[in-house]
Structure formats: structure tokens, C-alpha cells
């Protein structure tokens, strides 16, 4: 007997990773994406002010220097990214307009109504700000996130990079986990590792991670379909990571080859 189709809604940003996930899930048999809710990018100034409050001016200045450098690195990585995407058979084509809704913030009260109308069996999250507890509590089905790192050791951003930067290659990977109000603190469903080579860098690690994540998401959706979700232990200790500063990046590249 054929498995029943699972209804999926997505809460995501409009970045490459979200588009890759959409295009990969949309082609899977037994998956019906009923709605895609895309969050507009937050104000750069608001993000900057928030970082300064949390991290201090000096660290944020170092991060901005790295981000400027990474623009150049990103351009130099374009060919490798396309090569990897072709090899993995994944696409970052734009979202189709059918069932696409844009919101200023995923935490707008209107998000609840959009999700309720979509009647999902599961909600897949990618590339959004932290989802408010008021939104999560109003969602009646499992909410599942793809995190670019092994949790809870590499919560926050650029988890794969930070594992390599610390010489922790066996924990350079990706996690599919349930979403709670914390920062990547939800229960782990599935994890897997990646093995980048000398051609890879800060901008190509996520392509490897996304390719590994897709079968993990499918496994999680199968668990939802069967009502057999099982939380697994993650990798400790729990640590929260942010963007590297330029000097951290250069030091990590020299010490551990993390590019």
C-alpha cells in the first residue's frame, strides 16, 4: 500500500539554502508543499545594533571586516558552488509563485493564520530569525529545522566552519532538529557529517551540508507520517557560535586549514 502524502509548509528566508531545500523537497514522492512563507530580510542596521549589544563594538568590527573579505571569497567560490550543486543534483531555482506568501517577519501574528489555512502535517524551517514562542505554541504539528552544524556543540551560525576551525572534523556536519524557542536547542532528530576537501571554503561547506540534510529531512518527514518521531542525543558540550572576525578566520586558516 502506498504511504499517504504528507502535507508540508515552509517558513524560510529567500536565501540559496531555502531555495535548495524547497526544490529538493518538492520533487520527493509523497511530499506535498502546501505553502511557502518567506520572510523578508531584517534591516541590516537593526542586525548590526543587535550584534553590538550582544558582542561589543570591537568584535562586531572584526566580523564586519571578515564579511567584507568574504564577499571576495564568495565570488571566487561561484564556480565550485555550481560544480557541487550539479554533482549533488540540487537546484536553487526561485520559489514558484503559487502558494508563496511574503511576510516582513515570521513572527507576525498573520503567520499563524497562513499556517492554519495550509493544514500542514509538518513545518520545515530554514534561514529565518528565531521563531517566537507565541508562534510555535500556535502550530499544531512538528516544526523541524535544518541546522548547518552538529548540535548542541555548534549552535548559532556557521557550525560546519567552526568545527573545522577547531580541528573537530569528526563533528563537521548538519543537524535536523525540532524547533523550540531557544537557539538551535530543540531535540535532535538526525545528524550526519561532511568531508570537504581542499577546494572547499566557508561558502561551499553549506552546499555539502544541504546535500546531506535532504535525506535526513525526508527521514524526519517519514517519522512524522508514521507518528514515530524520536529525539536522539546530540553532541556535547552545548556552545553558541557567531560570525568569525577577520583575524580569527586568518588564524584558523593557518592553524587548521579552515578556509
What annotation goes with each model-predicted range?
Residues 1-259:
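One-carbon transfer enzymes
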Amino acid at each position: 500500500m502506498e504511504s499517504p502524502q504528507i502535507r508540508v509548509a515552509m517558513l524560510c528566508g529567500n536565501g540559496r539554502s531555502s531555495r535548495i531545500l524547497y526544490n529538493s523537497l518538492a520533487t520527493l514522492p509523497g511530499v506535498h508543499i502546501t505553502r511557502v512563507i518567506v520572510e523578508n530580510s531584517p534591516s541590516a542596521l537593526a542586525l548590526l545594533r543587535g550584534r553590538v549589544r550582544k558582542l561589543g563594538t570591537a568584535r562586531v568590527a572584526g566580523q564586519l571586516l571578515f564579511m567584507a573579505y568574504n564577499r571576495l571569497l564568495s565570488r571566487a567560490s561561484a564556480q565550485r558552488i555550481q560544480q557541487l550543486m550539479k554533482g549533488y543534483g540540487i537546484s536553487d531555482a526561485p520559489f514558484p509563485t503559487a502558494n508563496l506568501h511574503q511576510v516582513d517577519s515570521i513572527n507576525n501574528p498573520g503567520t499563524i493564520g497562513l499556517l492554519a489555512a495550509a493544514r500542514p502535517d509538518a513545518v520545515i524551517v530554514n534561514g529565518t530569525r528565531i521563531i517566537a514562542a507565541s508562534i510555535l505554541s500556535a502550530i499544531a504539528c512538528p516544526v523541524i529545522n535544518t541546522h548547518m552544524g552538529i548540535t548542541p556543540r555548534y549552535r548559532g551560525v556557521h557550525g560546519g566552519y567552526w568545527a573545522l576551525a577547531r580541528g573537530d572534523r569528526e563533528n563537521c556536519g548538519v543537524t535536523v532538529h525540532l524547533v523550540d524557542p531557544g537557539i538551535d536547542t530543540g531535540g535532535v532528530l538526525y545528524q550526519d557529517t561532511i568531508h570537504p576537501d581542499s577546494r572547499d571554503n566557508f561558502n561551499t561547506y553549506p552546499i555539502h551540508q544541504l546535500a546531506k540534510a535532504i535525506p535526513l529531512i525526508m527521514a524526519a518527514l517519514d517519522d512524522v507520517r508514521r507518528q514515530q518521531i524520536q529525539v536522539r542525543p546530540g553532541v556535547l558540550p552545548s556552545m553558541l557560535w557567531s560570525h568569525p572576525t577577520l583575524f580569527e578566520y586568518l588564524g584558523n586558516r593557518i592553524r587548521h586549514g579552515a578556509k
